[in-house]
Regions:
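Solvent-exposed beta-strand motifs enriched in subsets of small alpha/beta binding domains
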Residues: 1-69
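A broad "ordered helical/assembly scaffold" signature
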Residues: 4, 29, 44, 74-85, ...
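Short, surface-exposed, charge-dense and proline/glycine-enriched linear segments
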Residues: 40-54, 85-93, 159-166, 186-188
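Amphipathic, charged alpha-helical scaffolds that flank and support histidine-based chemistry
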Residues: 70, 99, 160-161
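Intrinsic-disorder-associated interaction segments
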Residues: 70-73, 77, 105, 168, ...
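Extracytoplasmic/luminal low-complexity segments enriched in Pro/Gly and acidic/polar residues
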Residues: 120-188
Length: 188
């Protein structure tokens, strides 16, 4: 019941009852937003309604790259970076939809399959380039890891929508974290 109340306020993530202090408190363990402004807006609203909130920012440094390749290869590499952003954004929106609109596991899996198909369409062309070390190797490694995680959540068996929603949230945070680590490594 408390989880539903918190979700109606805009909370998402892993909600659990904590009685360690002697009183029962409900905590949201993780929630992701596409911008700091969105997170701050939710934080301010929840705080004004008496909900204890802490906000942490996940970011990566801006990186500049010098690529020497033909125009189509450069477009594919730029598309790869955009694909990570789109997957992170798409999963963020999907997580909110699953929780807010009470979608079924099957509906959530279809959304994940669409995100995976788009991700594949933009990143698979990079596999045809010769040499998979350096920048290309980093991009392909992150793609492989994130693709495997998306495929796992899309193909998994879940006991409930809560289990599936938790898996989606984990995948969303995993891909954002893996992408940030890749960009940080490439930025050197």
């Amino acid at each position: 019941k408390e989880a539903e109340r918190l979700r109606a306020l805009g909370a998402a993530g892993y909600i659990f009852a904590d009685s360690s202090s002697g009183e029962t408190r409900y905590r949201v363990m993780a929630s992701g937003y596409d911008s700091e402004q969105s997170a701050k807006s939710v934080k301010d609203r929840l705080t004004s309604e008496g909900v204890e909130v802490a906000m942490y920012t996940l970011s990566s440094p801006q990186a500049s790259f010098r690529v020497t390749a033909d125009k189509s290869a450069i477009e594919d590499i730029c598309g790869a970076f955009a694909a990570f952003d789109e997957a992170i954004d798409g999963l963020g929106q999907a997580v909110i939809r699953v929780d807010k609109e009470s979608l079924s596991v099957a509906d959530g899996k279809l959304i994940c399959a669409d995100i995976l198909n788009t991700f594949d369409a933009k990143l698979t062309p990079l596999e045809s380039f010769s040499g998979t070390d350096g920048t290309l190797g980093e991009i392909l490694g992150a793609y492989s890891d994130c693709r495997a995680q998306l495929d796992t959540v899309r193909g998994g068996e879940y006991q409930s929508i809560v289990d599936f929603s938790s898996a989606m949230k984990y995948t969303h945070l995993y891909i954002a974290s893996r992408y940030a680590a890749m960009v940080e490594k490439l930025a050197g």
